[in-house]
Structure formats: structure tokens, C-alpha cells
Swiss-Prot record:
Highest taxon of source: Bacteria
Coiled coil stretches, renumbered: none
Cofactor comment: Binds 1 zinc ion.
Name of the featured protein: Transcriptional repressor NrdR
Spans annotated as Disordered: 147-176
């Protein structure tokens, strides 16, 4: 394995152990040339996945790119890295087990949205704003209303004195 510090091809494994969820092997390495220490992860790859972009272009699937986009959405949020890792592992497993070598970028985005919705609602809104290309404040309001609707208990029926009108929402004014 090439040393990320000096480029030497001679590195030594000092420690090797499975990750907590046993989906990868974590190896601690040292470079004898510069003394640099770094960690690598070895994972099973069931198949080479290709992402079919909206433009029609094809690109190799990059697990690290998926992880980076989640880290951006989850920045400064109280979510343990292990939960994010489990989510990414689950998404990759779903993609690999679909039996297709080409996956539409939309499918990946929907899986991420699904996972973030269960993980952290703020990160979900952050990711959705980029993924769905929000242009105005009302785009955020619609998504938040959708989130609120999924989290609210069932509305009272007409027999209970309820109406067909949705409950009034009080929200601070938004700045456009």
C-alpha cells in the first residue's frame, strides 16, 4: 500500500481488526521510510457499481463520495459516526444486492433521503435542499410540512368534531 505522506510503496501493517459491525477490516499501517502512520479499511465488494448520472454520463460508484455528502449534511449534528457508517453500509448493500451494475443517481439520492429522514431531520432537510435543488423558501416549507405531517398523530375524524381543514400551523416568518 502506498504511503499517503511520502509515496513509498513499502508500508507495514501494525494492527488489524474487524470493524464494530464486521463489515470491514481496519488496518493500522506505518511507513518505514518516513514513519508516517495511517489507517486503511478493507471491504468486500460484491460487484463494480456504475452511477448513471442525470446527464447520461456514467461514473464509478464512490463510497467515499457518499460518505462525504452525508458528513456535509450532518455537520455539527449530534449523530454518532458509527450510525452514519451503518447507514452507508446499508445503502451500499442495497445497491449491490439489486443485481444491477448500473444505478441511477436518483436511486442513490432516494436511499440517502430515506436514511437521513430516520437518522436526523435537520440533516434530511439540508440534504434535500441540495438534492432537490431548492430555489425558494417555500420549497423548504413544503418539505418541513411533509416531515411534520409524517410525525403528527392521526387527525381527528369528522365524528370527533374534526373538519376537512388541515390544522393551522404557526411558523415564524421566513426571509426570502
Amino acid at each position: 500500500m502506498r504511503c499517503p505522506y511520502c509515496g513509498s510503496l513499502e508500508t507495514q501493517v501494525k494492527d488489524s481488526r474487524p470493524t464494530d459491525d464486521a463489515s470491514a477490516i481496519r488496518r493500522r499501517r506505518v511507513c518505514p521510510d518516513c514513519g508516517g502512520r495511517f489507517t486503511t479499511f478493507e471491504r468486500v465488494q460484491l460487484r463494480e457499481l456504475t452511477v448513471l448520472k442525470k446527464s447520461g454520463r456514467r461514473a464509478p460508484f464512490e463510497r467515499e463520495k457518499l460518505m462525504r455528502s452525508l458528513e456535509i449534511a450532518l455537520r455539527k449534528r449530534p449523530v454518532e459516526p458509527e450510525r452514519v457508517e451503518r447507514m452507508v453500509n446499508g445503502i451500499v448493500r442495497q445497491l449491490e444486492s439489486q443485481g444491477e451494475s448500473e444505478i441511477a443517481s436518483d436511486r442513490i439520492g432516494e436511499l440517502v433521503m430515506e436514511g437521513l429522514r430516520a437518522l436526523d431531520s435537520v440533516a434530511y432537510v439540508r440534504f434535500a435542499s441540495v438534492y432537490r435543488n431548492f430555489r425558494e423558501a417555500r420549497d423548504f416549507n413544503a418539505l418541513i410540512d411533509e416531515l411534520d405531517g409524517a410525525a403528527q398523530p392521526e387527525a381527528p375524524s369528522k365524528d370527533d368534531g374534526g373538519t376537512d381543514e388541515p390544522p393551522a400551523k404557526t411558523r415564524a416568518p421566513t426571509r426570502a
